[in-house]
Amino acid sequence: MFHSVQEYVSKCETCQRTKSTTLKPTGLLQPLPIPCQVWDDITLDFIEGLPCSQGKNTILVVVDRLSKSAHFMSLSHPFSAKTVAEKFINGVVKLHGMPKSIISDRDPIFISKFWQEFFKMSGTQLKMSSAYHPQTDCQTEVINRCLEQYLRCFVHQWPRKWHEYLP
């Protein structure tokens, strides 16, 4: 069965256009400690540069490090730290409570004074990934890649309708 699936995928035109190849990461990886509880430790990232769909062109990706469960929220560029915080509260905190720690890249939103104070007041620890080392937050990068491939497969003919297919 494995060979049948492999052969089918190798001949699928949509798969060939939208799927990316994966490579083994270079160097020694130092994994982050495993969280103890679901939605206590999360990661945040943006997928930017999307075509405008219903006025939105960015996706905020929030991933739970333990369960690998994710939330995707669309945003309009330009957005502020306050707008992102409101989306985060309405889309994640209301459902799962406030996390104990957040890992994110060094996006200007995540290093803004507002964002720092917001999480300081809530008792959430902010952790930044190393500059130019996305493998620190590899799990979110994998989720981003999967979401991008999913959207490409469904909207390759109508790229301005990605918002309708956002899970």
Regions found by a protein language model. Give the residues of each.
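Integrase module of LTR retroelements
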Residues: 1-167
